[in-house]
């Protein structure tokens, strides 16, 4: 729900997290402040990459690792912006780096960690994109669970959109465990 027309990037969004209908900058203090963790992890990752010696005869994947580290930093900044400003443009600043990170890391996990070829990796990422695209729009069925009473609306306020990432994480984790990676 926004306060004005659907096409304005500065429209306020009041449908998410602990904000309610409070337009104040610090209406979501826990969500806003917790994003510092992403910034700290990104800085620590960049320092680690800078200090790690190159090993002769091994491929150097620093560019991809640095890109993922940059996305972690962008997640922290974008999420802070969304949870303080709560506008349409800040929502994109929040979700775009998260989506790019998920896709990039899933492709990395399939290709580098699990050893898939390029075609299976591409197909896996494409399937992941489709799952992400449609899972957040699954309508609630009244009476399914006590919290699904909003029949016809996206279930759990669209939070089912996170299920493909959780499933992918679990499947990759189990596969790595079975490979003893």
Predicted regions, residues:
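Multi-pass alpha-helical transmembrane bundles in non-GPCR membrane proteins
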Residues: 2-181
């Amino acid at each position: 729900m926004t306060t004005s027309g659907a096409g304005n990037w500065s429209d306020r969004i009041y449908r998410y997290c602990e904000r309610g209908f409070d337009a104040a900058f610090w209406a979501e203090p826990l969500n806003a402040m917790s994003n510092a963790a992403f910034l700290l992890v990104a800085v620590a990752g960049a320092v680690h990459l800078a200090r790690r010696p190159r090993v002769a005869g091994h491929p150097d994947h620093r560019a991809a690792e640095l890109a993922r580290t940059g996305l972690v930093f962008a997640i922290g900044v974008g999420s802070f912006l969304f949870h303080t400003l709560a506008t349409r443009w800040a929502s994109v600043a929040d979700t775009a780096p998260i989506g790019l990170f998920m896709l990039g890391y899933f492709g990395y996990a399939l290709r580098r960690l699990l050893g898939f070829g390029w075609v299976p990796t591409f197909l896996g990422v494409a399937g992941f994109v489709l799952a992400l695209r449609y899972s957040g729009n699954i309508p609630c069925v009244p009476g399914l669970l006590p919290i699904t009473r909003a029949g016809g609306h996206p279930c759990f306020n669209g939070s089912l959109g996170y299920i493909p990432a959780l499933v992918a994480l679990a499947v990759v984790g189990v596969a790595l465990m079975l490979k003893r990676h």
